[in-house]
Structure formats: structure tokens, C-alpha cells
Design a protein with these regions (language model features):
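Conserved active-site beta-strand element of glycosyltransferases/polysaccharide synthases
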Residues: 167
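A generic "structured core" feature
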Residues: 150-156
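Glycine-rich phosphate-binding "P-loop"
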Residues: 59
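Conserved sequence/active-site signature of Rossmann-fold short-chain dehydrogenase/reductase
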Residues: 106, 156-157
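Terminal amphipathic alpha-helical/low-complexity segments used for targeting or macromolecular assembly
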Residues: 1-52, 56, 130, 148, ...
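Flexible, glycine/small-residue-enriched loop-and-beta-strand segment within the central core
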Residues: 35-44, 62-75, 79-145, 170-171, ...
């Protein structure tokens, strides 16, 4: 039976950006983005400076981590809670009126468990308008959360979440329809 050989791992094909930009981002990210200071505007300034597309009102709470801002698009109003991890090895697009709650993770990378060399896999994540990602939830690569869908606390989503549907569990399964009332 074949075994995993991590010594053979090679992701040299993966080019997320210029090396200088990545290194400079790691410093700025550690000092200004992940820090516990309360200034969302400062986080937005640096994310935009490094190439994030950000429109409208966006609130980014303390402790948020973003792997590569130049692969991030946010169309506010959007709320991103404390300690959210956007591990965007691929593109992440967040539409208006989305809420990503505390400790949630958006993971655009994984590994091919069938490969002896444990090859890197990447894929995009799309959050359409009005999506709510619950606290401590995980959204995996190649996932589309359709309009106004909800991923409940601690759940894991991959694939497609249908519009106006609440999902729960690991793997996340449809629980019920989301009904929104005026007022």
C-alpha cells in the first residue's frame, strides 16, 4: 500500500503574488489587521492598499486574519467578526449585507488526500447577498453560499448552499427555510 510522502510535496506551481508583497503583507497583517485595536478604518485602509476590492460600509473587528488581500472582494455593508480567518489562497467574494461571525473560517485551500505527495488544492468562495456565516463555522473551497443562506454555529459547508436556506452540522445539511420579516 502506498504511503504519504511529504518530502515530495511541491507547490511551486502556486504563485499567489510577488514575494516582496507577500512578506510586506505578513508584517502589516500582524501589526494592523490581526491586532486587538478597535479601529476598523485602519484595517480597511491597509487591505485596500494591498489590493483588496472594498466598496461600501465594511466593519472588520479585531483579530481578523486575511491571507492575501489582493484576492479579496467585499461589497458592503458587511460585518466581519472577531478572529475570523479568511485563508484566501484563491478568490473570496463577499456581497452586500453579509455577516461573518466570530471565529469563522473561509478556507480556499486543501490537500489531495489521494496523492502520495499531498498536493495543494485551491478554489474560490462566494458569499452572495445577505449570507450569515455563524460563529466558529467553516466554509470550504469551491463553496457558493447563495442569497440569504445561513450556516449555523460550528457547521462546515462545502459545495452549494441554496438561497434562503438554513444549514447546520458537519457536513452542513439543510435544516429549514429562512424567513425574513419586516421591522
Amino acid at each position: 500500500m502506498t504511503k504519504v510522502d511529504l518530502a515530495g510535496f511541491d507547490n511551486s506551481w502556486y504563485k499567489p503574488g510577488p514575494r516582496w508583497k507577500i512578506l510586506l503583507w505578513y508584517v502589516v497583517n500582524g501589526v494592523f489587521i490581526q491586532s486587538r485595536h478597535p479601529f476598523s478604518g485602519l484595517r480597511l485602509f491597509w487591505l485596500k492598499w494591498f489590493g483588496a476590492t472594498i466598496h461600501g460600509s465594511v466593519v472588520i473587528r479585531p483579530g481578523v486574519r486575511v491571507k492575501y488581500p489582493w484576492k479579496l472582494k467585499i461589497y458592503g455593508p458587511v460585518w466581519i467578526g472577531e478572529d475570523v480567518w479568511i485563508d484566501n489562497l484563491d478568490s473570496v467574494s463577499i456581497a452586500a449585507h453579509c455577516c461573518i461571525s466570530q471565529g469563522a473560517m473561509l478556507l480556499c485551500g486543501n490537500h489531495d488526500y489521494k496523492s502520495a505527495k499531498f498536493e495543494l488544492l485551491t478554489g474560490p468562495i462566494v458569499l452572495e447577498e445577505g449570507v450569515w456565516i455563524g460563529a466558529k463555522s467553516v466554509v470550504c473551497l469551491n463553496t457558493i453560499c447563495r442569497s440569504h443562506s445561513i450556516l449555523s454555529v460550528g457547521s462546515i459547508a462545502s459545495g452549494e448552499m441554496k438561497a434562503y436556506t438554513i444549514y447546520k452540522g458537519n457536513p452542513a445539511i439543510p435544516l429549514r427555510n429562512r424567513e425574513i420579516h419586516n421591522g
